[in-house]
């Protein structure tokens, strides 16, 4: 659902991509994790009817590892993290001197900015904490905007370092 939800739609008796001109990116290891052998905890998040049409349409690019310049014309690179789920991609876009990071389920809401505040769905919570700490520190140092997909009030935030750790700069 939210890992790929909205990317496909039913058209008659087929499920097809909603955006026929879009390009989709996924790490090979995450694709295998989601399609070949999803674990019982995550199986409901990786609905094959949402995933396979993207591959079948030829719109999906699978890649290995963190990638700089996955889509250079958009200034896009992808950071891979392993705490929430195996090789989850965090898209990072540089445009007109600004950088924005799609925090995905690593930092889904403003309430999840403090490092110990995690999602209950994380498959490796201690790894999530390490990854989140490193990525948030880097975001502060590089003045990166953070886009949070699940926060209805704070879609894009600026972060700052405080005595309690990284927090919102409000």
Name each region found by the language model:
Residues 35-38, 73, 91, 113-114, ...:
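Short, well-ordered secondary-structure micro-motifs
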Residues 76-82, 100-105:
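Active-site-proximal beta-strand elements of phosphoester/diester hydrolases
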Residues 5, 13, 88, 96-170:
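Cap/insert and terminal regions of metallo-dependent hydrolase folds
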Residues 1-2, 9-11, 15-80, 130-143:
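Metallo-beta-lactamase
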Residues 30, 66, 82, 95, ...:
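A broadly conserved detector of short glycine/acidic/proline-rich loop/turn motifs that flank catalytic sites
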């Amino acid at each position: 659902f939210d890992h790929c939800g909205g990317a496909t739609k039913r058209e008659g008796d087929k499920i097809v991509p909603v955006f026929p001109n879009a390009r989709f990116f996924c790490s090979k290891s995450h694709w295998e994790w989601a399609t070949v052998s999803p674990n019982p905890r995550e199986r409901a998040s990786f609905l094959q009817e949402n995933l396979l049409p993207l591959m079948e349409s030829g719109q999906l690019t699978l890649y290995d590892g963190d990638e700089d310049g996955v889509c250079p014309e958009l200034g896009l690179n992808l950071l891979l993290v392993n705490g929430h789920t195996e090789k989850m991609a965090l898209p990072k876009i540089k445009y007109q001197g600004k950088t924005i990071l799609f925090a995905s389920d690593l930092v889904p809401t403003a309430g999840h900015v403090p490092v110990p505040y995690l999602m209950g769905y994380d498959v490796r919570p201690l790894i999530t904490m390490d990854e989140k700490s490193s990525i948030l520190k880097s975001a502060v140092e590089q003045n990166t905007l953070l886009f949070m997909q699940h926060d209805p009030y704070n879609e894009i935030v600026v972060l700052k370092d405080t005595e309690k750790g990284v927090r919102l700069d409000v």
